Amino acid sequence: MTLKVILGEHQITRTELLVGIATVSGCGAVVYCISKFWGYGAIAPYPQSGGNRVTRALQRAVIDKTKTPIETRFYPLDSLRTVTPKRVADNGHAVSGAVRDAARRLIDESITAVGGSKFEVNPNPNSSTGLRNHFHFAVGDLAQDFRNDTPADDAFIVGVDVDYYVTEPDVLLEHMRPVVLHTFNPKKVSGFDADSPFTIKNNLVEYKVSGGAAWVHPVWDWCEAGEFIASRVRTSWKEWFLQLPLRMIGLEKVGYHKIHHCRPWTDCPDRALVYTIPQYVIWRFNWIDTELHVRKLKRIEYQDETKPGWNRLEYVTDKNELLVSIGREGEHAQITIEKEKLDMLSGLSATQSVNARLIGMGHKDPQYTSMIVQYYTGKKVVSPISPTVYKPTMPRVHWPVTSDADVPEVSARQYTLPIVSDCMMMPMIKRWETMSESIERRVTFVANDKKPSDRIAKIAETFVKLMNGPFKDLDPLSIEETIERLNKPSQQLQLRAVFEMIGVKPRQLIESFNKNEPGMKSSRIISGFPDILFILKVSRYTLAYSDIVLHAEHNEHWYYPGRNPTEIADGVCEFVSDCDAEVIETDFSNLDGRVSSWMQRNIAQKAMVQAFRPEYRDEIISFMDTIINCPAKAKRFGFRYEPGVGVKSGSPTTTPHNTQYNGCVEFTALTFEHPDAEPEDLFRLIGPKCGDDGLSRAIIQKSINRAAKCFGLELKVERYNPEIGLCFLSRVFVDPLATTTTIQDPLRTLRKLHLTTRDPTIPLADAACDRVEGYLCTDALTPLISDYCKMVLRLYGPTASTEQVRNQRRSRNKEKPYWLTCDGSWPQHPQDAHLMKQVLIKRTAIDEDQVDALIGRFAAMKDVWEKITHDSEESAAACTFDEDGVAPNSVDESLPMLNDAKQTRANPGTSRPHSNGGGSSHGNELPRRTEQRAQGPRQPARLPKQGKTNGKSDGNITAGETQRGGIPRGKGPRGGKTNTRRTPPKAGAQPQPSNNRK
């Protein structure tokens, strides 16, 4: 069959046509493949491998297309139970033996906790049975049969005091499984490992065990700097033959591992727990240089090349000091000196000068000075290259003054050294003393039952009336609308679980926990309501009230929750301009704990009761009863406590109600200053408010503290100073009269920017990059902060997972700045760079030269663990033990009460009664609820039983008007819309649900 060509009379066969199409397609595919391959040869923006573009492209393409990630989650320190293990029987080496036993138990428990199996190399006879590699080298090995098993797919390779004897680490690493080792890695060149002496000669450790054997072995540098290592990959005989053609052209299979170490044993600081986590398996050409940088494990060489017969070892202490241990080979005498001192002494011209300098530095021990002089004597000084054992970094920890903890227990990591020495501390949230002390300091000690005078009550009533405006017949949102607004993944998950139980009354119980965030004092308590039904049903009212009343035109000048950063910045600058910069910053001290039940009843509750239709009043009051008087227990520890009547941070009412209390205090102060003015005029003078943060006119600077005390509150007032900017919502406005540029509160940010609280199974590089990328969005132009973030991204970026991998984690945005998650970023303008820098200098008290030096240091850093910490002159730590002892004002007359509460709560199920407790603080309240559930439907205290009301509300799905499809809008006295000037918000810019705090 033939096909006619459109032009002309020529004809071609179908076969010829198909051949032509195939040829053209094949050529196109070849050209496409060549272009893709050629792209791998691109010139990188950083040092790259040698060779030509073709070899670079070849190596990069093979690595990229063959990389296989290995997912393993393992953190053995979660199973650490004691850092000072003891043995009952003393066999001559009781301490070191107890540490070894504890290490074996820790390893076994941590492997079992993640569902793995153990594959041990030459195990102890007392070790558990299982797969193993057991050769007979020591007499003790004869206690078990010879075995040479193959590790299982879920195996963890374990070695206890055996790694020194392996010929090369690849013997352990080639299986591409985690390796866990308990090893001896000394921080000094001789001395005692607990009760066993050791020396070093010819780079071999001579270790003598009292009541045991003597061992001579080298030491692998597991604890050296560098977090990634490479190894060969073990293959079966079948795989080896199948891969033979690939090996003939120079391809080899390589595995990469991340190496960790810690020194958890207090009595044996020279003992280390080392564990490696496999990361990737790749193929690469062994005859082409690779651009993946890893370190190579090697034996530690203790000999000082510049001083024959001497050993030298550098290490970093827990106090971030670089020390040098020096001593003769094979001798027990050794001394330790700061490296900077030894560097200085090494350059002196005479031994007399060395002695004089040592005495001048306070070293008067003859043995100490003699050892230094003996080390100095002899040859020309050359700076040696010696191994350095780096310490694993630990965040600064907040120790409660009543703590019984032996070691810090925090769920946080540092990804660099602190930027400032007075950095924030992490709370020990796993310790019940931390929870107990936070309850006392943030609830019990600040409980407020003050009842204001008649005059103050009248002012508050006027404020509520003006805040509500014309709205008197609101309807709550429907259940469907509320579910749609509660759009956080965790909320949606909980709502799906209880969707068929929405008609059930919510449970009355608070489960509280310490917030895992850095701070300078006792950690905050999150008082969460575990029953999502309570959150759902209260949110029906809070969301409707916020949408219609609080965001109405008459409140928009002062009510700021729900605005995006640009709207907040514009509003603040407009307010400051209207006041001619005569403004003050207000910040309440522990507003949540100090709000009284009177304020909640007569401001927040009254406002909602008067705004909604009468048929919803009972339901609103019942919810407020629950918030004020609900019983509480510690979620982690189980003990019950009196939560007080203050605001509960996990309630949907927290942010809107706190903002209302804030505004009411200022309205009271304005009334004090202008008693004859019309209330409507004073209401229009209220400044921006959001939670406990606020801005006010300077005319009330003296009266606002008096107004706060009338309600039993404490307030801190700062007058606007152009040199340090204006702070609102933790953002500093550098010059609100001229620009909307803001920066993150610099001192607060610098104190905590080096910390991450992400899950420890997430690689540190990933957590660091995720965290600083958020700050680079909100503070891309902020001096010092942006420079630090760029440094972290530059140094951690190459080792971090791909953006696709990081985006798949649900916790990706956990540590992003709050405002980045609210559909907006704060405005910053390049022309304000100098202003931002000057404000930062004033607020941090770091002079300009030091700021410039830090910025230069960040730009030049090649290792994230280089020392960058700026020494702060003062410490802001409170209620804790700091590095110098008890922090100022941390121990006072409250200490006996703290200790008493701690001892009482040590037994879960008991709680200390409080005389000022709420109405529902009976000691048997929780058990009573259990009895109620056993007898029939669960009923909240003080609420009418199900079915006793008119059936229109009472917390269940309501019929009629509440099941509508839209948000109601209030009507004015004449039937017209009262909010005609307010345009509907744009898509994606709606006021955010206020069920959580900022």
Swiss-Prot record:
Which cofactor is essential here?
Mn(2+)
GO CC annotations? host cell mitochondrial outer membrane; membrane
GO MF terms held by the record: RNA-directed RNA polymerase activity
Which EC number(s) does UniProt give? 2.7.7.48
- How is activity affected by pH? Optimum pH is 8.0.
Residues in the active site? D692
User: Positions of the region Disordered?
Assistant: 901-998
Keyword Transferase present in the record's keywords: the answer is yes
**How is the activity of this protein regulated?**
Drastically inhibited by phosphonoacetic acid. Only slightly inhibited by gliotoxin.
Chief site of localization: host cell
The annotated topology with respect to the bilayer is: Single-pass membrane protein
Top-level taxon of origin: Viruses
UniProt cross-references to Pfam families, sorted A to Z: Noda_Vmethyltr (PF19222)
In this chain, composition skew of type Basic residues spans: 971-984
Q: Where is this region: Capping?
A: 91-282
Q: Which family does it belong to?
A: Belongs to the nodaviridae RNA polymerase family.
Describe, as the record does, how this protein assembles with itself and its partners: Homododecamer. Forms 2 stacked rings of 35-nm in diameter, arranged in a crown-like structure at the opening of virus-induced replication vesicles. Interacts with protein B2.
Q: What is this protein called?
A: RNA-directed RNA polymerase
